Structures are given as C-alpha cells and as structure tokens.
A protein has these predicted regions:
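Extracytoplasmic ligand-binding site segments that recognize negatively charged/polar headgroups
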Residues: 59-74, 87-101, 108-243
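Conserved C-terminal helix/tail region of periplasmic/extracytoplasmic solute-binding proteins
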Residues: 40, 335-372
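A ligand-binding cleft/hinge motif common to bilobed small-molecule-binding domains
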Residues: 120-124, 245-263
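Extracytoplasmic "Venus flytrap"
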Residues: 36-45, 54-72
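N-terminal secretory signal peptides
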Residues: 1-25, 34
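A bilobed periplasmic-binding-protein/Venus flytrap-type ligand-binding module shared by bacterial periplasmic
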Residues: 162-169, 207, 275-287, 306-307
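Periplasmic-binding protein-like
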Residues: 144-145, 158-161, 187-198, 218-222, 228-229, 298-320, ...
C-alpha cells in the first residue's frame, strides 16, 4: 500500500501536523489591527446571492505551473453558481507573490483573492494590513495548523510531493520510493526533476535530502543524467507521457484513475514534503463578496470530499481512508519558507551543481498586470 489506512487522524498524528510553527505567533511583532471576524453563518446559496448583487465577477491569482491550470476549477465553480464569472490566473507562486507586491505598491490591485505557495508572503501581507479577515463556514472543522487564528488566511487543499512513476515503464514494486532509490543504475537517463533553485517546494525537498544524505548525493544524482525542467507539473507530465520513467518532484492523486499512465506513491522510509496551500482575500478586493463565496466553496465538504490528496477538514475522510499521519511535517516547511537568507544560500549552492535553470516560464504569464 502507498498510504496508511485509518478512518481518521489520531491525536499523535495531529500533533505531528502541528509541529514546529504554530500560526498564532507566526506574523511577527506588529499587531493585527483588524477586527477578528466571527465564523460565517450564511450558506453557500446566500453567499452566491450576495456575490451576484455585487456583480458576479471574481479574479483569483492561483499558484501553478501549467497554462490555464485551474480551468477545471473555473468550470466547476461557474456550474455550481450560475451567473458567476470567475477567472483563476495561474502562474508560478513566486511570480504571483511579487506581482501582488508591485500592484499594491502601485495602488491598483488586480486580483480579489490568491492561493499561492508562499505562506511567508501571507504573513507579511497580514502584518501590513493588506488582507481581509474571513472565517468561512466550517472554520471550526479546519485543522488548527492549517489556518491563521485571526482569519487572515487558511489552507484550502493539502499538497504533497513524492515519487510519480510511469506505470508502463516501472512496476510499483520496482518504483523508487526513497531518495537513494533514484541512484539505482536502472534509472539512469530515465529521471526528470524540477530545478530546485526555481521552486521553493522542490528546494525544501533537496534541503531534506542533502541534510540526510550529504552533498555527495548530488554528485551521484547528476551521474544519472537527469533531465531538469521548470515546474513540478511539467515533470509529472513528462512521466505521464512516457518521456521519462520517474520523478520525485511532483504531486498526484492518492488514488490513481483507472486509465492513468502514472501513479503517485509515498516514501517507505524518508520524510516527504507536504503543505496546506494558503488562500486569502485582499482588503482592496473589488469583489469581496465573490471572494468570500469562492473560499467558502473551496473548503466546503462538497469540494473537500473530492480532494486528490488530503482534505483540510477533520470531518472529511481521505481517499481510500488514507490519513496524513507519518513522515511529513508541514510546520517545518513553513519555517523553511520564512528563512529567506537560508533559502538564497541553498539556491546558490544547488546551482553550482546543476547549473543555471534553462527554459521559459512554463505558464507563459508575464508582467505586473498580465492579460487575464
């Protein structure tokens, strides 16, 4: 089996989730000046009516690395809420973060809400009073470490990176699960990985590997003639198409579709990367009611029940009964993202081994105010 099977999180497992960085003290010395809201009492249908009265439009900046990578989410949202018109502009999280900073500095914010990787940016925006606090329905069911206690932001889905393998090229029993498995001569010329110095999530993976295996691991890995790409989704796509057999810098559903050409599996011994993807509404949002509807829908049971990996709600079961219970520590990833000096040093160190990243931004999105 690729995951543990139990009906719900144990207290011990939940304690692991809350390791390292409680949100209550994460923002810094500046006080949170805005009033902490009560939990939303309106239903999704009532929120829908309010959003339509506001105009029915919504602009979201979403983290990702495939063009129009949230098209399915847009379609599902518009179908669930007739009359709404949502646009989720997908770009690399690091680019969206600085894009939002630039827009705020210019006094013209283009998005109403955002869900991107950089939780350190959300902490800063909260401290600067840039976020509109909101606690959607079901707030009390969201794991405590997946939400800001003041309602400034909350996790809307859980992502994990681990092995993805092509099922026609590698059997599950032979698939590499731990970092050392990727050094097996059988996988020479068959590995695709994301540039770690281009992606903070993958950078964390390599930080963990080097801390456990030493820098000699990089020399051995490079002898495998790895193909390096920009973005985790392009790495997964290369495996799905059969261009390469394996990667460990990608995500995938815990339960693969029957016709899938790839499969996602967790390590046997190593720890693995996981994090709740944070989302927030901006204080200067042009469509705050629509943004509240969107966040409420994302964390609703009807959406969380369809999670590809783990839900953010404790009252929702994971696919196949899998639980978030071993060898993963989201709090450590949060602390890692906040130490920007260490990140920059690690990027430079890895670039000395791998070389400068090559290729364009895979989303094709450019500029401070990109065309939506």
């Amino acid at each position: 089996m690729t995951v543990l099977s139990r009906p719900q999180l144990s207290r011990r497992a939940l304690a692991k989730l809350m390791l390292a960085a409680p949100l209550a003290g994460a923002v810094g010395p500046r006080a949170f000046a805005q009033a902490v809201p009560d939990i939303e009492r309106r239903s999704l249908d009532e929120l829908h009516k309010a959003a339509l009265t506001e105009g029915g439009e919504l602009m979201v900046y979403g983290g990702g690395d495939l063009p129009n990578g949230s098209a399915a989410t847009e379609k599902a949202f518009n179908a669930r809420f007739p009359g709404m018109k949502i646009r989720i502009l997908v770009d690399r999280s690091k680019y969206h973060a600085v894009r939002i900073d630039n827009q705020l500095a210019l006094g013209k914010l283009a998005c109403d809400a955002a869900h991107i990787l950089q939780i350190n940016s959300f902490d800063r925006w909260k401290s600067d009073g840039r976020l509109l606090p909101y606690k959607p329905p079901g707030w009390d069911q969201i794991y405590p470490d997946f939400k800001d206690p003041d309602g400034a932001y909350l996790g809307v889905t859980v992502f994990a990176f681990s092995t993805v393998f092509n099922t026609s090229q590698v059997s599950e029993t032979e698939a590499p699960r731990d970092a050392v498995d990727f050094l097996d001569p059988r996988f020479k010329d068959r590995i695709v990985l994301t540039y770690p110095h281009d992606d903070d999530a993958v950078l964390y993976q390599f930080d963990r590997i080097v801390s456990e295996q030493g820098w000699a691991y990089m020399d051995k890995l490079l002898k495998q003639n790895v193909r390096w790409v920009r973005g985790s989704a392009p790495a997964r796509v290369a495996v799905e198409k059969g261009d390469k057999a394996v990667t460990f810098t990608a995500s995938g559903p815990l339960t693969a579709a029957a016709n899938s050409t790839s499969k996602f599996v967790l390590p046997k011994n190593d720890s693995f990367l996981s994090w709740p993807q944070p989302a927030a509404i901006f204080r200067d949002a042009q469509h705050p009611s629509a943004a509240k509807l969107y966040l409420s829908w994302l964390v609703s049971k009807e959406v969380q029940d369809r999670s590809r990996q783990w839900p953010v709600r404790r009252d929702v079961s994971t696919a196949a009964g899998a639980v978030f219970a071993y060898n993963t520590y989201p709090g450590q990833f949060r602390a890692f993202l906040q130490d920007r000096v260490r990140l920059e040093r690690l990027r430079d160190q890895l670039e000395q081994y791998i070389g400068p990243m090559q290729g364009p931004n895979p989303t094709g999105v450019e500029g401070i105010y990109p065309r939506a």
